[in-house]
């Protein structure tokens, strides 16, 4: 049987963009009778060795290691994901693994933007060595591919396969009703830059709801302190982690989904909102977001609080919301994970 190892420092129940990507890709491959093992750590964002060593999740074998993975069993392909979460024993072993003279299995890597982020001279050098050693690199956007090529990675090795969107985003019944709030979905961490939205809300007649796991407790404390300093307790709510059903219901009823991250590989929550026909507002710092969202067409791209105020005022017009929502549904029809997984499997088999 064709066997794929997915290697990722963190995995579900940790829910970030990379973790959700690996789960959905693995689940679809299992449906195609591919034997998939996810190798990961037992860590969460905030606790070490918290999770059980082994489980089967939707047909996916999940093997959680105490410190790092060990190469064995000669899988058909090794697919690496996102070494950028933290420089750990896991990452060190992976870097050393790539220095081995020969490995039977083809090596594929989806960097999830880490190859285009500056992590210091030593880490950048190690990443470039990985780029030379892998057989293929998967970029999730044309922007990421162009950035990698500009940094010296071999363009002939890079294939663009965008992130998919979970079938539930397409199929879950639409929640009726409308409430006047912006919804910010993302882990609580400085690079997600929720503080920008909070600073803007003080001068806007709209509420802000935040959902997502806490990766950085200090940043959550900073957020809540700033909310208190600005007297926004009635306008800003942090709901923590919610179910997928609750997430989509919150999306459907919102004025817009907002994301003002400093950096993103693609911004899967923005794509989920587009599938639901919900308007989106994105910051211009994470350049990839403006390749998905065209200002005034299927959402708004902002760089300041005034831009956000202007976007909110435009979205108060039901005709504008309806037109943007319809544009988003039209754009997003090809984003089902099965389509994405077929492209990835085709790539694997081209290396066999």
UniProtKB/Swiss-Prot annotation:
It comes from the Archaea. GO terms for biological process: protein glycosylation; S-layer organization. It holds the Pfam family Glycos_transf_1. Pathway: Protein modification; protein glycosylation; Cell surface structure biogenesis; S-layer biogenesis. GO terms for molecular function: glycosyltransferase activity. InterPro entries: AGL16-like, Glyco_trans_1, Glyco_trans_4-like_N, Glycosyltransferase_grp1. CDD domains: GT4_PimA-like. The keyword Thylakoid does not apply. Disruption phenotype: Reduced molecular weights of the S-layer glycoprotein and archaellins due to a change in the N-glycan composition. The tribranched hexasaccharide glycan of S-layer glycoprotein is a pentasaccharide that lacks a terminal hexose residue. Keywords: Glycosyltransferase, Transferase. NCBIfam families: glycosy_Agl16. Belongs to the glycosyltransferase group 1 family. Glycosyltransferase 4 subfamily. PANTHER family: SULFOQUINOVOSYL TRANSFERASE SQD2. This is Archaeal glycosylation protein 16. The lineage of its organism: Archaea, Thermoproteota, Thermoprotei, Sulfolobales, Sulfolobaceae. The gene is agl16.
